[in-house]
Amino acid sequence: CIKNGNGCQPDGSQGNCCSRYCHKEPGWVAGYCR
């Protein structure tokens, strides 16, 4: 899984966060796990 602080996409296209939460705000190209 993707560790906290690393890049992710909410739709899971880049893998799943260990925390299961990908934080992404409007306008961001990518989010990050937290």
From Swiss-Prot:
Keyword hit for Transmembrane helix: no
Keywords attached to this entry: Antimicrobial, Disulfide bond, Fungicide, Knottin, Secreted
Keyword Repeat: no
Domain of life where this protein originates: Eukaryota
GO process terms (BP): defense response to fungus; killing of cells of another organism
GO CC entries: extracellular region
Pfam families per the UniProt record, alphabetical: Antifungal_pept (PF11410)
InterPro entries linked to this entry: Antimicrobial_C6_CS, Gurmarin/antifun_pep, Gurmarin/antimicrobial_peptd
PROSITE patterns: PLANT_C6_AMP (PS60011)
S-S bonds: C1-C18, C8-C22, C17-C33
Recorded family membership: Belongs to the AMP family.
Free-text comment on this protein's domains from its UniProt entry: The presence of a 'disulfide through disulfide knot' structurally defines this protein as a knottin.
Job description of the protein: Has antifungal activity against C.glabrata.
Name of the protein described by the UniProt record: Antimicrobial peptide Alo-1
Organism: Acrocinus longimanus
